[in-house]
Amino acid sequence: MTNRRNFISSLTRVAAGVALLASGLSAHAADTIKVGILHSLSGTMAISETSLKDVALMTIDEINAKGGVLGKKLEPVIVDPASNWPLFAEKARQLIANDHVVAIFGCWTSVSRKSVLPVVKELNGLLYYPVQYEGEELEKNVFYTGAAPNQQAIPAVEYLMSKDGGAAKRFVLLGTDYVYPRTTNKILRAFLHSKGVKDEDIKELYTPFGHADYQTIVADIKKFSAGGKTAVISTINGDSNVPFYKELGNAGLKATDVPVVAFSV
């Protein structure tokens, strides 16, 4: 938690400083520096994104208690895109054009980021994106603060294949059906092939956002694991994580039997 708070604190200072330099006298005339908080507080992603909102607000309070940035207090402007991807774009436009925030801290899923991207490019805004992503994108208006697959997913799989990690020979690539899981799993499949893992030892499964019934999928995982030491790489997002792990428990699948590495809890 401390590292995350310090990280957001440093990003907030950078965003405010850049914005003040860029906007000149109009920024100095304001009593506060506005920053946008664009995280889902309702819908399927709220279980993940609400905590990011809370940490951002806590950090802003800490910065303000120490005098703010360049003598000005940070003023958070909070909106709820409600796990609705087009609404992310609408709320981003509102924050930049109407609320005049100097930067936005927001999004979780890559689909929400890609929805916001055209808006921040058009209005020359700044988006600080807080979590891992699939790579294959680089925009000057976005700070990608999370890990790409070569920094997170591949090292995790390498560990699972090692003796210390359990020497997994078979892999279930399980994710929510959108760009980040599919791209990450494409990269992982190629990596596994390079390590001699055959297609018949890789099982790739996807569910929609908000999916709640994992009985069949967990039964498939249990059956698949009978063919050799198996690990699950989960890119399930949002509140679907809850029924997935509950079903693992119901099926009697323990981490010692089938370990699960998750990137989007």
Locations of the language-model features?
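Beta-alpha junction/loop-to-helix N-cap segments that form part of ligand/metal-binding clefts
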Residues: 47-54, 67-136, 145, 207-214
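Periplasmic-binding protein-like
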Residues: 95-108, 128-130, 170-175, 227-238, ...
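N-terminal signal peptide c-region/cleavage motif recognized by signal peptidases
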Residues: 23-24
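Short beta-strand segments enriched in small/hydrophobic residues
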Residues: 32-49, 107-108, 170-176
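Signal peptide-proximal N-terminal region
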Residues: 30, 54-76, 166, 194-199
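Cleavable N-terminal signal peptides
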Residues: 16-17, 27-28
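Extracellular/periplasmic Venus flytrap/periplasmic-binding protein
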Residues: 90, 141-251
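N-terminal export leaders
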Residues: 4-14
